[in-house]
């Protein structure tokens, strides 16, 4: 009888632990369903709010130096989220056109995140250098954008303002 009770209690404990494990895994699964079921195009405007340049060797800007930025995003005139990016200066194509390898994380309030990365070429501008228009390949997403693919066209309007046109496909 003692052996039977031990077996029943052990079985109940194992079943309880297995049930909790399954429920934990199920609750960790994202609730957001992908929104990208057909091709989508939309534009957000960005305004730079934070900027920091890190010069790793204390000399002129060159390979290995990097910058980090934060941008406020607006869509149809309303706040839409933020963009964080980091660019590392690479070897120049020409002395007047520095290049950088850049990572971008667009966080859209209540929707998810879209990530992208690319090489960016800069051209002389009145304020120093400004990126020439370029396209970013989308590398991933979360939440509503978890299945996003495509590209983002980037056009700088001035030093602190840019437009990002997303061309997303499922």
Language-model segments: residues:
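Targeting-peptide/extracellular-domain and disordered-appendage signature
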Residues: 2-9, 17-170
